[in-house]
Design a protein with these regions (language model features):
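Extended interaction regions within the primary functional domain
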Residues: 9-13, 17, 54-58, 132, ...
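Short acidic, gly/pro-rich beta-turn/loop elements at beta-sheet edges
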Residues: 36, 76-78, 90, 101, ...
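Intrinsic-disorder/low-complexity, polar/charged segments enriched in Ser/Thr/Lys/Arg/Asp/Glu/Gln
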Residues: 22-27, 65, 75, 88, ...
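Glycine-rich portal/gate segments that line the openings of hydrophobic small-molecule binding cavities
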Residues: 49, 58-97, 150
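Beta-strand/loop substructures that line and gate deep hydrophobic ligand-binding cavities in soluble
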Residues: 94-145
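A short, structured loop/turn motif at beta-sheet edges
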Residues: 34, 82-86, 107-115
Length: 151
């Protein structure tokens, strides 16, 4: 692979352009402490309550891993990869064809108020990137918006 001047990668084995995709949700303010928000996101079963209405499957596979599917989309398995108490949770793809991470950034505003933002990052070929950018942006916005009423 070689990095081009514009920051894209070229995979010379496949002659495909690899895009580094970074998407961020809006920040949402919760009437919960940073510790409460962290604890909620640390328990993977809680992600079921954050999912969009068009979810067709949700299953906790292990204490730190879950599977979900949205109608018309393939199943995705996410595994907790990193946790920094009260400030950051990183979920990563666990198997499958796509390698990506979903990071929850938690900031304390006050003792009983916090701010959460989700960030999606991954490397995809240009065609895949164009296809998934819109749905993933909407997906992470839905997850963070649903946090307000989830707990």
């Amino acid at each position: 692979m070689q990095i081009q001047a514009n920051g894209t990668l070229i995979d010379y084995a496949t002659q495909k352009t690899i895009l580094n995709m970074n998407l961020e949700s809006p920040k949402v303010t919760l009437d919960k402490s940073a510790e409460d928000a962290f604890n909620f996101l640390s328990d993977v079963k809680n992600f079921e309550s954050l999912m969009p209405e068009n979810i067709s499957k949700f299953e906790v596979l292990e204490d730190d891993k879950f599977l979900f599917a949205l109608k018309g989309m393939p199943e995705i398995v996410l595994k907790k990869k990193e946790a920094i108490p009260n400030s950051k949770i990183v979920l990563g793809a666990a198997g499958g064809k796509l390698d990506f991470a979903l990071t929850g950034h938690i900031s304390e505003i006050d003792t009983d108020k916090s701010e959460v933002q989700l960030a999606f990052s991954g490397e995809f070929n240009a065609m895949m990137g164009m296809m998934i950018k819109g749905p993933i942006t909407k997906f992470i916005e839905t997850l963070v918006t649903n946090m307000k009423s989830a707990f």
